[in-house]
Amino acid sequence: MRILLTNDDGIHADGLAVLERIARTLSDDVWIVAPETDQSGLAHSLTLSEPLRLRQLGENRYALRGTPTDCVIMAIRKLLPGKPDLVLSGVNAGANLADDVTYSGTVAGAIEGTVHGVRSFALSQAYSYVAGHSIPWDVVETHAPALIAKLMRIDLPPGTFLNLNFPNCEPGEVAGVDVTSQGKLDFGLSVEERTDGRGLPYFWLRFGDRKGNFRPGTDIGTLRDNRISVTPLKLDLTDYAVQDIIAAALNSEVGS
């Protein structure tokens, strides 16, 4: 089985090293194509206004000056000797839950793999943002190999990929695995204005207190219960339930 690894935290990220160890428990044909620099929050973006610079760092290991989407495209269309059987994106430092998935470069790596018809999983490890708290990488490293092996035996529909989130706890405290839906999260974003040395303003986006929907069955609620969240997502964003409502309203307007 050929496995392609990518991420959005960059080629030297701890989470990518963890993901490589996970992948090598499943296969000896592992390829890594990851961004040269941190690409967090760039979602499913392409680099179209400047060239893509590629560096080989070792056997089947490459750093690309581009986004996670660029990395998957470069790997599948240029570098690999054949299409991979699995794309793993991550392991992200921090959970990708609820509305996070629309911003996440980690999730975008799985999206692009799915665009190319390859089974794809995004992996993220939750942790406490309180100063002094480390990221419990041993949780995902302990539990992901068996979980991925089980998920590989499932025949997913075309256009579907999986978003895996691992809880912030000790490996032995993980209470199980839930198949979840996306929750709802308010990031509490604000815009902070500062002044540079020339007296000109510049701005930072800042996260405040996050408020969300923690009900059972959602990705957020599941992680709070120290359970692994597996959320099936799909490329098709069409809201089929609303199609007929809109069509009926438009037809009514035309006839009036």
UniProtKB/Swiss-Prot annotation:
Name where it's found: Cytoplasm
EC assignment: 3.1.3.5
Protein keywords: Cytoplasm, Hydrolase, Metal-binding, Nucleotide-binding
Task: Give the matching SUPFAM superfamilies.
Answer: SurE-like
The protein's required cofactor(s) are namely: a divalent metal cation
Can you state which reaction this protein catalyses?
Answer: a ribonucleoside 5'-phosphate + H2O = a ribonucleoside + phosphate
Co-factor binding details:
Binds 1 divalent metal cation per subunit.
The record's principal subcellular location, in a coarse class, is cytoplasm
Catalytic class of the enzyme: hydrolase
Q: Which domain of life is it from?
A: Bacteria
* Residues the record lists as binding a divalent metal cation: D8, D9, S40, N92
Q: Which GO terms describe its cellular component?
A: cytoplasm
Q: What are the GO MF terms of this UniProt record? A: 3'-nucleotidase activity; 5'-nucleotidase activity; exopolyphosphatase activity; metal ion binding; nucleotide binding
> Keyword Cytoplasm on this protein?
yes
- Pfam families named in the record: SurE (PF01975)
State which residue ranges cross the membrane.
none
Which family does the UniProt entry place this protein in?
Belongs to the SurE nucleotidase family.
Q: Which HAMAP family match?
A: SurE (MF_00060)
Q: Record's PANTHER family?
A: 5'-NUCLEOTIDASE SURE, 5'_3'-NUCLEOTIDASE SURE
State the protein's purpose: Nucleotidase that shows phosphatase activity on nucleoside 5'-monophosphates.
Q: Name it.
A: 5'-nucleotidase SurE
The UniProt gene name for this protein comes to surE
